[in-house]
Amino acid sequence: MTQMLHSLLRAVGLPVPEGLANPSLAMVSCDSRSVAQGCLFLGLPGEQVDGGSFWRQALAAGAEAAVIGPAAAALQPPGPTDAVVVVPEPVAAWVGQLAAAFWQQPSSRFALIGVTGTNGKTTTTHLIEHLSVAVGRSTALFGTLVNRWPNYSVPATHTTAFADRLQAQLAQAVEAGAELGVMEVSSHALEQQRVAGCRFAGAVFTNLTQDHLDYHCSMEAYFEAKAQLFAPPLLESGSAKAVVNIDSPWGARLAQRLGDTCWRSSLAEGVLQQADAELKMTELTMSSDGVQGRLISPCGEGWFDSPLMGRFNLMNLLQAVGVLLQQGLPLPLLLKAIADFRGVPGRMERVLIPAADATQVPTVLVDYAHTPDGLENALKASRPFTSKNLCCVFGCGGDRDRGKRSQMAAIAARLADRVVVTSDNPRTEDPQQILADVVAGIPEGTTCTVEVDRAVAIALAIAEAAPGDVVLVAGKGHEDYQILGTSKVHFDDREEAERALKQRLDG
């Protein structure tokens, strides 16, 4: 695929500077280290460094031209003969639009659904992918764990990729035959305009609870970042194309803003039941084997049977079905396909030992819960697995929102019978100080152990748990690394739990 530079600029409404050459472009890149001949360098401002300031290096490496912002131009002023286009603020929005235009607007060539919220994004996107494929739609998934579409699958490096890579992935998925795509859209991606240039056919708001306040500074700013997904130019205007969880106060606020352009989803019952919810569930029966019930929608209602655990997964199910109904998929086939979805790695995942007698060891669950709301949901979902004791192993990440540390500790103390506080990803913070911040939220009288070494903490919890107890290891889920300082070292909660279970059986 090639495009002429002048045509590309005009396609997004940018003027062509006088005297600018008009080379043929074969690629676009935001990384000056990966440019080659035929490349348009897109200088993206970053949190620490303005990528546009590397335009000279990009041109020296073979880039045909560079697009930069006013700040980069002030740092490294281009001369009249340089192949540089200076765009106005917001630079990131122009970068996204240029990348989308280069790849011929891939998001407009299939039905792209965006999912945002503090918790539930990964499970909901995987559910949407599973259900869509089950009813015969060729589907692409872009998310925290993996990016995949027909005949292609690669582990993801970001929840939402940067614009140059994201638009290339969308184009590849469309060329591979994907008819529908589903994307996790983080608040960082929305605030940094990584999805600028995307056109979403549908959107889901899962919930909003405290997280990332080190970045957004306030819940109001966090909410407004998420809300960008539900308005033009990202979400197509017209009939209802969004599904919003109104059991979340922030979701109720968003739904009020959207009016008839969204379907409201709710699990509230009795006097709390949301009469105006288009999507709801009734006659629910939950057990350690999963959940059964009736799903009600504007397209009809029917029975479903799911092996997923926890009430929070019911909202994930409800919203996944709802947004696919908005895209015209049939309710009976969607309900049938729910039974075959076994979950997502690192989300309430049970650690099992082959050939082991389950009655001789505790039940061990690994979950990604790393926010107050997420930890509360995971603990409540774990409780039905035991009539005995529930142990919670968790920590809090360094260099991140400190306000949630004591909140998570209080939740663990309230809902678990025993708490083991340990390290998560300490990053550049003192691990002992993080532990002190967490322990400050644990009431006196709580059975609590503090162990800075996460592997030792997991082993200790499993060794001391009785058969029939449940040990919930929370915080890292699918992650196979731990961030110590500025380095990543291999670490997997599931591997450590399996090792501890084997050691227990071996005596």
Curated annotation (Swiss-Prot):
GO terms for MF: ATP binding; magnesium ion binding; UDP-N-acetylmuramoylalanyl-D-glutamate-2,6-diaminopimelate ligase activity
SUPFAM superfamilies documented for this protein: MurD-like peptide ligases, catalytic domain (SSF53623), MurD-like peptide ligases, peptide-binding domain (SSF53244), MurE/MurF N-terminal domain (SSF63418)
Residues that hold UDP-N-acetyl-alpha-D-muramoyl-L-alanyl-D-glutamate according to the record: S32, T159, T160, S186, Q192, R194
Motif (Meso-diaminopimelate recognition motif): 424-427
Principal subcellular localisation of the protein: cytoplasm
Pfam families (alphabetical): Mur_ligase, Mur_ligase_C, Mur_ligase_M
EC number(s) stated in the UniProt entry for this protein: 6.3.2.13
PTM field: Carboxylation is probably crucial for Mg(2+) binding and, consequently, for the gamma-phosphate positioning of ATP.
Subcellular location: Cytoplasm
List of residues that carry N6-carboxylysine: K226
Gene name per UniProt: murE
InterPro entries: Mur-like_cat_sf, Mur_ligase_C, Mur_ligase_C_dom_sf, Mur_ligase_cen, Mur_ligase_N, MurE/MurF_N, UDP-N-AcMur-Glu-dNH2Pim_ligase
Organism of origin: Prochlorococcus marinus (strain MIT 9313)
Keywords: ATP-binding, Cell cycle, Cell division, Cell shape, Cell wall biogenesis/degradation, Cytoplasm, Ligase, Magnesium, Nucleotide-binding, Peptidoglycan synthesis
Name listed for the protein in its UniProt record: UDP-N-acetylmuramoyl-L-alanyl-D-glutamate--2,6-diaminopimelate ligase
Residue numbers binding meso-2,6-diaminopimelate: R400, D424, N425, P426, R427, G475, E479
Cofactor: Mg(2+)
Function of the molecule: Catalyzes the addition of meso-diaminopimelic acid to the nucleotide precursor UDP-N-acetylmuramoyl-L-alanyl-D-glutamate (UMAG) in the biosynthesis of bacterial cell-wall peptidoglycan.
Binding site for ATP: G117, T118, N119, G120, K121, T122, T123
Known catalytic reactions: UDP-N-acetyl-alpha-D-muramoyl-L-alanyl-D-glutamate + meso-2,6-diaminopimelate + ATP = UDP-N-acetyl-alpha-D-muramoyl-L-alanyl-gamma-D-glutamyl-meso-2,6-diaminopimelate + ADP + phosphate + H(+)
Gene Ontology cellular component terms for the protein in this record: cytoplasm
Any one biological process term the GO annotation gives: cell division
Pathway listed: Cell wall biogenesis; peptidoglycan biosynthesis
Keyword Isomerase applies: no
